[in-house]
């Protein structure tokens, strides 16, 4: 029952899917009729995100094209729903630009402009840091670029929060705190760190709290 399977994938938003063997999922997808898959655009979005997590980028791109085709073939889709689908597609594609904040930000803004509700493929209780103990470590790219990268984080994260229910909240403040610490501005670092702690308090995003804790220990 591929219809039922795709509905479960949509409702689960990829949480249980992540515990499955990627090869099993890929084999099942190969067996699923394309016409059936096209009827479940939200499930395609969840699968795209899962393919990114599994580093199955060619399959991710194949699913993206299938999504765009499915949307194009269904002119009866309301404009708001169409915007949410295309916006979430942009959001998922932004992960391919990691760790170029400028490129990611362009796609986050595009998604934010199109979407009227939060993404279904990203849960705000899920990890944001991909296991990294440092936001600065994730996004600092080269000498002389730090000020621009901090400004980009300040600009892009509100757009990202809007479409993910605050996933990764506090990231820009943590990066500011880490940057100030590395520059020897310890008072500024402590102020930014406390601001980050206040922003993430009680939201269940332990990965962000751990980044704060690692900096506090230093």
Where are these regions (language model features)?
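Internal alpha-solenoid helical repeat scaffolds
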Residues: 35-214
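Long, low-complexity regulatory tails in eukaryotic proteins
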Residues: 216-218
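Extended alpha-helical scaffolding segments used for macromolecular assembly and cargo binding
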Residues: 1-53, 59, 63
């Amino acid at each position: 029952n591929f219809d039922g399977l795709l509905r479960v994938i949509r409702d689960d938003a990829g949480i249980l899917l992540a515990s499955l063997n990627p090869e099993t999922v890929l084999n099942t997808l190969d067996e699923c009729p394309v016409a059936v898959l096209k009827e479940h655009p939200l499930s395609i979005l969840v699968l795209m995100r899962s393919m990114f997590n599994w580093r199955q980028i060619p399959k991710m791109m194949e699913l993206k094209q299938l999504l765009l085709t499915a949307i194009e073939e269904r002119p009866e889709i309301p404009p708001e729903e169409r915007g949410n689908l295309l916006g979430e597609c942009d959001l998922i594609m932004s992960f391919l630009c990691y760790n170029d904040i400028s490129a990611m930000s362009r796609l986050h803004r595009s998604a934010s402009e199109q979407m009227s509700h939060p993404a279904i493929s990203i849960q705000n209780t899920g990890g944001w840091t991909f296991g990294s103990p440092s936001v600065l470590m994730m996004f600092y790219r080269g000498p002389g670029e730090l000020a621009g990268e901090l400004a980009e984080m300040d600009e892009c994260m509100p757009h990202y929060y809007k479409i993910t229910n605050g996933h990764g909240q506090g990231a820009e403040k943590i990066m500011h705190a880490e940057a100030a610490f590395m520059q020897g501005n310890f008072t500024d670092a402590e102020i930014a760190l406390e601001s980050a702690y206040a922003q993430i308090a009680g939201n269940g995003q332990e990965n962000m709290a751990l980044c704060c804790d690692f900096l506090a220990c230093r």
